[in-house]
């Protein structure tokens, strides 16, 4: 099977994004978004999902990181959508409980063709460094809308905001890594009784 790799650009008046994603990679990454914390989260996502991800974003970070974070989520979702197409042959579902020290997060995904984000995450601070914590939800909302996909994050424990968000991105990597795997026994089938995912 050929590697499932895609490159895309997404340019607006607020951000310019170049992205290459290999769904069948080994977890290699080169990421520069202009936001150190977002870089860190995307590196964790790629490593734990075993995706190869090369991404640069030039955004209006002199304002804040909102546009950069949201638009990177949108672009990453678009990359998944374009590469997976009609979702033929994939497992479709993935879930993972990720412990990060005192934090415990569940991420569950359904590459369903329908957008839902359940963000049941309760951070204890509004910022990690200079990153606004609320931007993490905007990232995953942009991603879920662009695939489109159903994505659930549920927090069972956690006090340290960095640990909570790190567990979210690592868990999402594991869950999406499982969801995009090819089902060798049914690789020519769309994983739905409807015959269509929408």
Short names for language-model regions:
Residues 1-198:
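N-terminal intrinsically disordered, cationic/polar leader segments
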